[in-house]
């Protein structure tokens, strides 16, 4: 069966929620029994977001196969069952890199390389490749219509729509319909101008998703339909909602999934949203609440920890609790002391890079260990917990990571120079390797030790979790730390790399080298986060 395409663009302003809208529509189509995937096309020139500042771009989401991608792919995986891969996200930088590589290799036989056709052909080829095998592929274009950067992507999609046939393509455009309090009405003119901008490059939208803080009246929807040349039933009002997980039902109530299926002549059962109804019920009917302190380096932009934030909320759903997240800059722990950690039910230290704020994370781990506060450390949060234990329990006063201090007496964390990837191939790195694309990335197997909290939570011996790091526990110094009581409860498949540590005689102190947040979903949660939030609730009873 041929793949059908839905191209999602945005207009008027950025940050309207194209990714959430695309994921919600995908969830609806999946609930009708269709096989759906989503792709994100990013117009920036970086090859991938792997080396971009978290405070500028937000979180880097890691896929099962090790791609460092846009955080929207996290939304996609939280809404649908399809796992994202390297094929689901590419940038202008990646496209140009590939075209230039082919030119140097002589693939173009001496032709003059141009945006059209060479860049647009490469974009089309990647979209077709990523969409192969699915009933519907939803392709989101980053940025706003009118941006210079996104023009090659839009031109490529215009051409693709012509080539595969308009009966197999839908252009879905998100716009802002602002409410003007002084006039007491919503204004449709920005939407009309945004559609005019699309028309100027040869694209007629088939569906308009109109973002507003309220439902758009029927008469205004009729006006938008008339002046934008779109059927009235394809003008969808998408108001602000309390939970993003309400959006699939909101789109369904206006018949968007039915419109798509009719357009593509797809037969399917009515969308079964019972799982989403259960999510919303648990969200609306909590039996208690907990406050989790997230001690990080990039807390000025919560999106830098988007998947962690969502995983905590999912754990709240699992435990029927409302989770309040208190963001604490790890540098504040250094300058103001551990008083900033008081009145927390649990403490989570997420990943990060660089020495800034690390001593604050180490102090945080010490505070949680000594005061019996439930602690979950992720990536750097595990490494700082191990450094703290080495310094204050194992007597290794100068313990540190070679990432931060090159010549410390006890480099308990060191650069991984060799590891085995998921296929069993050995990868090697040195301190001179490029920063981009050189980490231990993607899903790796982990062996859990019998009798550990981790084994109890997961309920099985072997798990698979996603990684993004280039430093690991130094095995030569590990015996000294274990002799002081620290338990290693998770190891890599070849038993060479430490994956999970636990502090014994503590209510709940678990830290992992991998990133469990990337596989947490609202429907299924994640065992580590669920166990952590449950322990935080039990901590209130003390």
From Swiss-Prot:
The active site is at 379 (nucleophile), 515, 517. Pfam families: CTP_synth_N, GATase. Allosterically activated by GTP, when glutamine is the substrate; GTP has no effect on the reaction when ammonia is the substrate. The allosteric effector GTP functions by stabilizing the protein conformation that binds the tetrahedral intermediate(s) formed during glutamine hydrolysis. Inhibited by the product CTP, via allosteric rather than competitive inhibition. L-glutamine binds at residues 352, 380-383, 403, 470. Mg(2+) binds at residues 72, 140. Residues 1-266 are annotated as: Amidoligase domain. GO terms for cellular component: cytosol. Keywords: ATP-binding, Glutamine amidotransferase, Ligase, Magnesium, Metal-binding, Nucleotide-binding, Pyrimidine biosynthesis. It is an enzyme of class 6 (ligase). PANTHER family: CTP SYNTHASE (PTHR11550), CTP SYNTHASE-RELATED (PTHR11550:SF0). This is CTP synthase. Homotetramer. UTP binds at residues 14, 187-192, 223. GO terms for molecular function: ATP binding; CTP synthase activity; glutaminase activity; identical protein binding; metal ion binding.
